[in-house]
Amino acid sequence: MIRNSTNTNNIMETEVALKDWILYYHKLCEVNSGEIFSGNEIITDFDDPVLSDPLLNLKPLPKNEVTVNKDNVIKDNDYSSNGCDFAKSKFHIKGLVGLLTTASVYIGLDNSTNPSYDISQACEFDLEDNTVQQGTGRSANMNPACKVAGFNKSSVRDTIFNIFKIPKKDEKISNDMEVNNTLSRDLDYKKDLFEFVRKYFGISEEETLIGHYTGWLLQEVLIQGNLFITNSSLVYLAHLPKLTDAVVLCGKLKLRSRLKGNPRYWCVLKHSTLALYNDPSDIYFPILSIDLNHVEEISLENSLKDENTMTFVLEASSKNYKFIAGSSHSAKTWVKCLKKQLFSIKNQSKDTIGIKFPISSIIDVECQSYMNQGQSIKVKCFDGNKNYALKEYTFLFFDKDGDSFYNIISNFIPRNMNPVEASLQNSNPTIHLNSKSHFNDKIKILSAVNIDDIICDTDSFEMTSSDILSDIDENIQPLSLKHVRDISNCKNYLKEDLKTSNKMTIQDCNKKVQTSEIQLITYSKHDSRMELNDDSKYYQGNIGNDNKGILSFKNICSIWNTSPIHNKDSDNFFMTSDPFVTSINDTTLAKIKDWFNLHDNEVLHALYYAYLIKGYPVYGKLYVTNRRLYFKSCIPGVNVKMVLPLEDIEGYNEILGTNYGNFGILLTVQNEKELQFGFNSCTNRSDFENVLQRCLDICKYAIKTPELVTSRVIESESEHSRLRFFEEKFSTEGIDIPFLVEDNPYFKTKIMPTKSYNFGFLTIGSRGDVQPYIALAKGLIQEGHSVTIITHREFKSFVECHGIDFKEIAGDPTKLMSLMVEHEAINVGMLMEASSKFRGWIHDLLVTTWEACKNLKLDILIESPSAMAGIHISEALQIPYFRAFTMPWTRTRAYPHAFIVPDQKRGGSFNYLTHVIFENVFWRGICSQVNKWRVQTLGLEKTNLAQLQQNKIPFLYNISPVIFPPAIDFDEWIKVTGYWFLDESESFEPSQELETFISKARKLGKKLVYIGFGSIVVNNAKEMTRAVIDSVLETDIFCILNKGWSERLGKEELRYEEEPEYPETIFLCDSIPHDWLFPKVDAAVHHGGSGTTGATLKAGTPVVIKPFFGDQFFFASRIEDIGAGIALKKLNVSSLSNAIKKVLTDKSIKRKAVSLKKRVAKENGVTTAINCIYSELEYARSLVVKKNHKSSNIEFIQHPNNVNDTTKTVIPLTSMV
C-alpha cells in the first residue's frame, strides 16, 4: 500500500511518466528494454516531499518528441547540425562510471528471465529516515565471526585537541625576540601579558605571580582566557574577538511560514546578519536579512521533548523566525553558531572581560574530570559586603594544567576558613542535581548575552565591583557541568529573575566600588570608560516593518522628479556649496540602518530615486555609502532589496534609457553579472556616476585585495571549522555549548588535534581520478595526519613519489575498456562475456578493497562513489565515511546527472529524476554481489538503497563554485570545496624542442593553441587527425597537439595506414602538466574532463570542449553557460575552425576567462576540503552509530525465489488506482 493523499490521477500519470523515463534511460544504454522490464509493479514513496515534488510534476515522455543520439545525450528530433562528426566515439559510454553502469545493467540481465523480477527491482526509492523496509534477511550460512574479522575496534583512536599559543611577531611583545628560540618567545609573551594584567587590574608590585594557565570561563558561551594566580589574588582576563565579515556558517534552511509553507533558502551567517537568498549565486538580492541586534533568544524547538528536533527559533523584538534544518545535528550547529555570534554582537564594544577576587575570599573549590584529559573546576568565593553572598565561577581546562590550578587553589582554602565562613558554608551547602526535572525546578542561571547588563563603570581605572552582580545572582545555585546542555531551556527563570532584581544606579556603583573585594571589568582600547549602551529599545518594532518605507502610487510621480540628496554629515565628502547637500535627520538614518543592517563604519553619502531593471522595472531608492550600494523598492506589494559591495563593481557604462528611465547606467560586477538602473534626468545620472567613482577610488585604495564573491556565501575560515569540530567532540560528552576563542594581542590561538587520524582514500579509474587525492593527502599530511591512497597498481609510483603511502587493489577498469574495444557492437556474445567478466571484476574489487582497508586500521575513509565498496566497509569498521567526486552525484533539481545531460535544459523535475534513475540502475547491477559480500565477508546484513541512505553521506565536490555553484537543495553536509590542484609545474622540465616551438610562435606573432582529447576511441582516428590538421592550417595558428586518440585506432583495417604528415606549425607532444602549459597558450581544445577544465579556468585560458562521454557533456555545457568557452557538438574542419577563431577573437570570452582566473586563484580547495572534514566529522560519525542502531531493529524477510535480490517493498500498480 501507499501512504498517499495525492490525487489518484496525478499518481497514475506520474507512474506512467516514471516508467517511460526508466525505459528511456535504458535506451540510452542501448539495452533492449523488453528484456529487462517485464513486470507491472513499482516502488516509491509519495510521502517524501523531496522525492514526490519533482516526480508529481513529471509528465509522460511525449511520443516522437525526443530521441537518443549516439553521443549519449538527449536530442530533439528537429535539431540539426551541419557536417559530419569525425570525433564521434566508437563506443558511446567510455567514462569509468559509464562503463560500470553499463556493465551493471548487463549483469542485471541474468535476472531478467526470472518471472518474479519486476520494475521495482530497478527503481527503489529512498524512504524517510523513520521508515523501515522489510526484505531479505541474513543468509543461513553467515558466520558472525566474520563481522570484523582481523579488525580490532579498540584500535580506532579518539581525538582531543591541543590549543597552541603562537606568540605574535609584534614590537610591543619583544623587540629582540628570536624567532628560532621558541622557549624565549614563550617566556617573553607571558611576561608581557602579565604586565598588561598588572596594569589592567591595578595589581601592586608586591604581588608575585604563582601560576599562569589557559582556562575557559563557563557562561552562555565558553570564553577562552588567561588565569593568573598571585599570592593574594585570582585573576581571569579574556580578549573578546571582534566581528568580521567572514562567513561563519552557511547552508540550506527552510523558513516556516503560514502563507508560503516552508520555503527553502540558502542562509548565510556573518557579522551581525543572517541573510536568506533564493540561490547561492544570487548574493546581491537577499530575500530576508535578520539583524541579530534585535534577536533576544535562540533555542531549539521542544528540545526537552524531542532530542532530535530539526527546528530552531530566533526570537526577535517583534517577530519570531522558525527554521527547519536538514538534520538535528545541523540544527544544533546553527544554534551554537548563532548564540556565539549573538554574544559577540552584544559585546562588540568591549575588548576584554576581566574578573579579579582575593584569594582570601575563596571558600571551596570542586574538580570534575571529563574525556580523560580535561577538568572542570568550580571556584566558590564570598563577598563580605553583601551578607557573605556566594559567588561561583566555573573554569574548564582542556589539558593537565587543571590539576596544577586545582592544587594551588586548594592549598589556600584551609587558611581562608574561619568560624563565620564555616557556618556560612554549612548553611549554604552545594546542591548536586541529578535529574533534568529537579534541575529545571531549582536552577537559576546568569545569562552572559550582554556584559553591559551586569556591569557598570566609574571614573577610576579600578572601576567595577561584583556588588553590582549580587542583586542578580544572589540566589544562583551551583551549576554542574553535566547540566550545561539544559542552559538554553532555563531562560524563563532568567527573565523572571532579572525582572525582580533591583536596578542600581551609577551613583550606587561609585559608592560601593571602594569597599569591593571582587572586580569584574570590561575594557575597551578606544575608551577607558565603559558605557551602558542599549540600542535594542530604539529599534524595537522596526524589524520586518519595511512597509514603512513604501510609497503610495500618488507620490511616485512627484518623487520621480526629485533631485539627488547628498548627506551633509558624510565626513566632508561634499562641498558646502553643493546644491544637493541636505541634512538627513536621525530618524531617517536609523531606518536606513535598520533596513540594511549597516555596519557602524558605514557612512551614507547620497540618495537617488531610480528604477532597477531586474527582469521588470522596480522603482525605489538607491543609496550610496562608503562601502556598498543599496536599493530598496518603494512600490506596494514589491519587496526587492539589493546589497552590492563597491569592491565587486568592475565598471559602468551609460546606456540608452528605457521607457521607465530615460537615462540608464549599466554596472558590471565581479561575477560578470550586469545591473541596470534608470534615472529621470541626465543630471541625476551624471551625479550618481561622479559619487560612485569617488567611492570606488577610495574603496579600491582601502581594499587592495577584494573579497571573493563565493567567500560571501561559503565559509572558508579554517579556525571556524576546527572550532566546530572541537565543539562537536565535547557535545558528545554533554558539553553542548559554543566555544569562543579569544583574540589576544600577544599570541594567536591555533587548535590542532593531539593525535593524527589515519585517512584512507579509495578511488578507481584514471590518473584524473587519483591526482586530486594526492593534493588533498599532502594537505592532510601537513596537518599531522597519515594518509594512504588505495587504488590500482599502475599509479603506485605516481602516488609514492609525493611521499604518500600506497595500497593496491584489483578492479582495473582497462579490462572493461578492452572488452568494449574487442566487440564492435552490443550483441549476445558481448553480453555473455560482460556478465562473466564483470562478476569476477567486481568480486576482486570488493575483496581486495576490504582487505586493504581492514589491514590499514583506518580512522576515516574518503571514497569516490564509483569505487562502490567504501560505504559498506565503513559500516563494518564503524568509522566515519565521506564521499568525494568531480561530477554531480547528489540528487538536486539544479543539475542533471553528469551521464544523462540533455541538449537543452528540461527543468528541475528532469534533473532530479536523472539522479534517481541512475542510482537505481547502478545499484541494480551490483546489489546481488554486494549483498553476498556483505553477508559472507563483512558479517553485515543485506541492504538496499533505502537503508544505505546515500543522500545523507557527507560529500566533498572537488570542483570550483565558479563552474558548479552549490544548489539551493544541497544539504549542509554537501560541500563544493574548489579544485584540489596538484602543482607539478615546478618539477616539470620541458624539452628544448618544445621551448623553441613556443618561442617561434611568439616571435611570429601567431596564436598558440593546445589540442588534446586524451586516450579516446573513435570510429576513424585518421579522419579525425586530418580534420585537426586542416583546422590548424585554416586558422593560421601554432598548435601543441597531444594525439592520444591515435594510440588505439578504431578499425582494424585502418591501423596500418600511414600517419598523416604534420606541418611545422604543429608540435606533437606526450603528456605535459596542464598547470605549466595552459598559462602559455592562447586557447585550449580538449574533451572536457573535470581536471582539464579546472586547469583552463585556473590559467584563464579560453576553451573549446568537444565532449565524448560521461561528465564531459556536463562540463561542456557549464563552460558555455558561464561564457568562458564553446561546447562543440560535432568535430569537423568547419566547426573546429570556427570555434577556434571565436575563442581567439571574442573579447567577451577572453574577459570572462580572465575574470574566472582571478576567482579560482583566490580559492584554496584543499584547505576548504580539510575544513569541511573537520566540521562534518562528528556528523559522519553519528551516521555510523545511527545506521548500526537501526540495523539492530530491522526484521528481514527472505524471498524464496531469489535469495540474491535486494530487500524491497513491492507495490502493485493496481493498488494505486
From Swiss-Prot:
Annotated ranges, domain PH: 246-343
GO biological process: ascospore-type prospore membrane formation; carbohydrate metabolic process; lipid glycosylation; sterol biosynthetic process
Catalytic activity: a sterol + UDP-alpha-D-glucose = a sterol 3-beta-D-glucoside + UDP + H(+); ergosterol + UDP-alpha-D-glucose = ergosteryl 3-beta-D-glucoside + UDP + H(+)
SUPFAM superfamilies, per database record: PH domain-like, UDP-Glycosyltransferase/glycogen phosphorylase
A Gene Ontology term for the protein's cellular component: membrane
GO MF annotation, one: sterol 3-beta-glucosyltransferase activity
Protein name: Sterol 3-beta-glucosyltransferase
Source organism of this protein record: Vanderwaltozyma polyspora (strain ATCC 22028 / DSM 70294 / BCRC 21397 / CBS 2163 / NBRC 10782 / NRRL Y-8283 / UCD 57-17)
Gene encoding the protein: ATG26
